[in-house]
């Protein structure tokens, strides 16, 4: 690779993220806030379908599951065995909130669970770069500029070393994290490692979930004691399950669906608002400035014994004529498992 390490340091997405963390006062190192050391998302027990502002007795739901993943894959897993699926406790796009709520961002990789001390391998051949102020984050930059970064890893390599895919141990998982945050970036954009054809094998037969739909105003819940007035926000709380069991204490925790869409139809079936994408993490993530557009107030990430709430903004200040409507919400993961729910909505 002919590019100098100084040039790599200036151009890598990892370098940009760490530089931003330094400028914003958020520590991205081994004792960083949740925005850079993401705590996996906690999961409440399976709930019955409910809707706070939409009558739960009238809500309906449909699901479909896909349990195969034929490949091929661009790369295997960064921990042994390379061609066997490992538990993933944090998904791409999950909300990450740190620095006492002042730092909010989308999770830009996946969290692969493994015991502390587990050897982590390079998933591509390339040059090593380690940020001097954050020595437990290792990047491997390939000849084409593709960057794989590994967070919460005690390095066994140095900046400038040459890494060989699935031969070079770049480090070992640092205690007490019990996972490696694994990220992929190309052309300045983070990509979802769980997209089709990327990391494999990855089989997912779990179905995403629409927990509830609420109508709100100024962050306040509007109760269904009477018909809603126009000019309210619609918020959907969604989640998904991890396909493999996660070790304690991060067991049975939710993750974010890869795709969420919605539409509005009149009670007699006329489409009022067509299908609109709220969040699409299947390939990449929105810019950081879109966080508050995507995630509603009250969204929280998971902590041990403290379930997170993933609240997506469907619409803000929705203006509708008086009448009866149906809100349809659909969620999907990267493997095609999907669910849809219909919620009645009365506007006075």
What feature does the model see in each segment?
Residues 3-14:
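Bacterial N-terminal signal peptides that target proteins for export
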Residues 118, 144-147, 189-190, 270, ...:
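Short acidic/polar mixed-charge low-complexity motifs
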Residues 147-149, 176, 251-321:
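Exoplasmic/lumenal beta-rich domain surfaces
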Residues 20-44:
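C-terminal region of N-terminal signal peptides and the immediate post-cleavage residues
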Residues 38-137, 158, 165-166, 175-180, ...:
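Surface-exposed, glycine-biased beta-strand/turn segments
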Residues 337-348:
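Short beta-strand elements
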Residues 121-122, 142-169:
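Short histidine-centered loop motifs in beta-beta connectors
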């Amino acid at each position: 690779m002919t590019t100098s390490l100084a040039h790599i340091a200036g151009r890598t997405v990892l370098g940009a993220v760490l530089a931003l963390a330094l400028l914003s006062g958020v520590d991205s190192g081994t004792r960083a806030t949740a925005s850079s050391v993401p705590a996996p998302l906690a999961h409440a027990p399976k709930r019955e379908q409910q809707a706070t502002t939409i009558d739960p007795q009238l809500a309906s739901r449909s699901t479909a599951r896909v349990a195969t993943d034929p490949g091929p894959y661009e790369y295997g897993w960064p921990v042994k065995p390379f061609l066997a699926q490992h538990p993933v406790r944090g998904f791409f796009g999950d909300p990450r909130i740190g620095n006492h709520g002042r730092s909010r961002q989308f999770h830009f990789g996946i969290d692969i669970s493994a015991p502390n001390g587990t050897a982590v391998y390079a998933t591509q051949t390339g040059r090593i770069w380690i940020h001097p102020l954050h020595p437990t984050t290792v990047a491997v930059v390939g000849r084409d500029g593709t960057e794989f970064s590994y967070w919460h890893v005690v390095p066994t390599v140095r900046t400038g070393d040459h890494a060989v895919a699935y031969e070079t141990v770049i480090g070992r998982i640092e205690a007490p994290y019990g996972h490696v945050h694994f990220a992929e970036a190309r052309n300045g954009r983070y990509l979802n490692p769980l997209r089709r054809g990327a990391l494999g094998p990855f089989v997912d037969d779990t179905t995403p979930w629409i927990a509830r739909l609420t109508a709100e105003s100024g962050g306040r819940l509007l109760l269904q004691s009477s018909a809603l007035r126009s000019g309210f926000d619609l918020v959907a709380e969604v989640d998904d399950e991890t396909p493999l069991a996660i070790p304690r204490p991060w067991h049975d925790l939710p993750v974010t669906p890869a795709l969420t869409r919605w539409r509005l139809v009149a009670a007699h079936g006329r489409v009022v608002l067509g299908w609109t994408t709220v969040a699409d993490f299947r390939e990449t993530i929105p810019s950081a400035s879109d966080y508050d557009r995507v995630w509603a107030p009250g969204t929280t990430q998971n902590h041990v014994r403290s379930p997170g709430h993933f609240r997506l903004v469907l619409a803000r200040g929705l203006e509708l004529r008086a009448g009866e409507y149906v809100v349809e919400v659909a969620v999907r993961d990267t493997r095609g498992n999907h669910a849809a729910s219909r919620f009645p909505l009365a506007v006075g």
